[in-house]
Amino acid sequence: MSEADEGGGGLRGFRNGYGRLLEVVVAALMIVLFAEVTLGVVFRAIGRSLIWYDEVASVLLAWLTFYGAALASVKRAHIGCPEVVDALSWRARRALNIVAELLVIAFFVLLGGVGASVLPVLATDALVSLPEIPMSVVQSVIPISAVLIVIAEMLHLVD
């Protein structure tokens, strides 16, 4: 067995490392979201509500969703119809997989492009409860996660 087959090098090694990086990002977002919501609940319980905690929690949940989608792309964990695909011949299955990958890549290239074009428009807007944080930072998750998903899908396409 070669080093590339064991996940230690080459494209498979890169994909495994890429997946681990996204796992760390998703885990960190989950920990921060948990801590932030817990902090908000504690402060509310003692009668000193934080005005920003629900808005930040919403942003963190959105980020978790987008970065989690990128992680799911790396792990091939999105919902599919394997029974239908498995009923096809190997050649038809391969062709269908390639077409599906290309459609997903095209969609996320479009989403990333549109998401990036919106960022300058949002540069002057900010979170309501934290005006120091521009909406462009909040919404940057869209083009960033689109690029991450395109990378993941391209890794599977060349596999």
Predicted regions and their residues:
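Alpha-helical transmembrane segments and membrane-interface helix-loop junctions
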Residues: M1-D159
